[in-house]
C-alpha cells in the first residue's frame, strides 16, 4: 500500500514537565532488555524497556492516534491501545529495520488483544536532542526503486515531539553514539484489514 501521507508529526507538542513526568515514571521501573524475540539478537535490537499502564498516559496519547488517523485519511478501525513501552537507547544501542504489525492477529495468550493486530504506531521523543547523538528514527516508504524511500524523521528531534504512522511501515532507530535517547512507544490495535 502506497500512502499519500505516510506519517503525521507534532514537533515539540508536549511540555518539558510532561516529558519529565513520563521519564520519571519509566525510570522508576526495572528496565529490561528490549529484545522481544525468543532468539535474542542484539544485531536486530539492543535497548532497554519498561511497560507502563497508567491511565493518564493513555489519555495523553489517544488524541494523537485519532487525529493522525483522520487527518492522513488512513481511516483505520482500532479497538485498543496496547500496553505502553518506555524505551531507553544508550551508546551502541539501536533497533534495526522492522515493522510493528504482526503477521497474524494475536492469539488467546494475548488476552484482551486476542484477534487484533497492530495498525498504528506512535512514538514520543522524551530526550533533548543535545543529550544524545545518533538514535534517529528512519522510515521506509514508497517503491523500493525510489532513491528517497528512506527518510530520517528530523521533525521529531525536539523534545516532546510525537509521530504516528501505520504499523506496517518499515522503520528503525539508528545506533546511539553518545548519551541516551528516551521514548514512549504505543500501538493502536484493531481487527484485521478486510
Locations of regions flagged by a protein language model:
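Fe(II)/2-oxoglutarate oxygenase catalytic core
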Residues: 1-164, 168-194
Amino acid at each position: 500500500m502506497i500512502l499519500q501521507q505516510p506519517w503525521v508529526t507534532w514537533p515539540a507538542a508536549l511540555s518539558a514537565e510532561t516529558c519529565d513526568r513520563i521519564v520519571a515514571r519509566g525510570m522508576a521501573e526495572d528496565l529490561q532488555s528490549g529484545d522481544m524475540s525468543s532468539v535474542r539478537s542484539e544485531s536486530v535490537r539492543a535497548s532497554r524497556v519498561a511497560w507502563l499502564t497508567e491511565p493518564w498516559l493513555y489519555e495523553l496519547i489517544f488524541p494523537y492516534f485519532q487525529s493522525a488517523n483522520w487527518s492522513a485519511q488512513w481511516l483505520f478501525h482500532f479497538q485498543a491501545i496496547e500496553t505502553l513501552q518506555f524505551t531507553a537507547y544508550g551508546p551502541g544501542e539501536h533497533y534495526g529495520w522492522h515493522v510493528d504489525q504482526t503477521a497474524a492477529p494475536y492469539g488467546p495468550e494475548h488476552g484482551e488483544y486476542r484477534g487484533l493486530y497492530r495498525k498504528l504506531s506512535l512514538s514520543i521523543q522524551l530526550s533533548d536532542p543535545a543529550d544524545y547523538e545518533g538514535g534517529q528514527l528512519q522510515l521506509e516508504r514508497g517503491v523500493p526503486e525510489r532513491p528517497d524511500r528512506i527518510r530520517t524523521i528530523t521533525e521529531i528531534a525536539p523534545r516532546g515531539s510525537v509521530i504516528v504512522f501505520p504499523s506496517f511501515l518499515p522503520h528503525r532507530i539508528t545506533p546511539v553514539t553518545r548519551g541516551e535517547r528516551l521514548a514512549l512507544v504505543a500501538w493502536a490495535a484493531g481487527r484485521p484489514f478486510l
